[in-house]
């Protein structure tokens, strides 16, 4: 079709430029960027400027539909087509002689650029090539950009010796022999996080949740993570490195855990960020495992597998339990007769939940919600309050330090907060899967009748918790 023909034509054009440049012994720069950087105004006519310096310019289109180039030695989880093409272009450039160099444009560290730039830099540096990054929108004029490109061009003319190549390094793989390692995980929420330990213990793993983030988390995160990555990622990296540097853990018997959604959110690539930070900090001997559902996990971890068939009922009830407790607390804290009563009840019922989870008795969590509803009713005065919802990136809206305690501030002003809950984040998977299959973006892995059966199972659990919780007079299903 027309699109395939276009891809073929533009790739052949780039290949012709390379052949002709080599015949004439002229330098070539592969100028990579996002699709919108093809607009001359957005890129400030950088491609034209480079050409005026006597250098032939090609784009990452030279590797379009090229199946011979593989990018296996990377930390990055491949998410978007243009990202994958830039990675392949970097790998292709790394294999070429000194007459071909790589320059990448970025604007405002957009989207997953922070992860991508780190990966491209590593690919080139491991193969003894420089990485030139042009942050287009960080300057008021292109004079400084022109100076950087001119410096690269002059170095090409001097044909410097190619640097030595280095092997790809990554953190240790979590093997079957590592099942007894203590697994540390970053803190996320005051609600679900405390219950992770009993859930994991039920599956045979010893997990320890790290303390909530603080100023030192941000400071360490900025030291070891790309400074243009999103704030939650900075905090998570800081928490993990601080823990490993604390001396509290036997590093030969410790592992790190991080969630992985498998979608197009940047959170999917927190794994890459953490591994790179751990290597830079000297903790390459500590394995990293990812937590996800089914095939959404993109990490080699042969020794780590959650027993979903065993833990799913109690894990689902724990999720609904903590979502419900969060609603109870935020409706009560602005109506409590005695200051601190809502927090004490919240903590009480979070502690009570540990034993039913360890004993794999999900029905007891429903019973505790019934008891909690009565106790929360008792501590509340009849009062109408203004109500505000809090939305945002998943870690940001759940983590108090990440959102600078905005929820607590609103509560102190007498405003009832409709808190973020985790359930919708997981339920969207049903909609996403169905639409991806319709658009032929994903193969059908589960028969629809099984998926529908599982959905109805979850829906019944939700209805049960809503009925039970509705005895609390300020509960919103």
Ranges and model annotations:
Residues 1-477:
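An N-terminal assembly and electron-transfer interface module characteristic of large anaerobic redox
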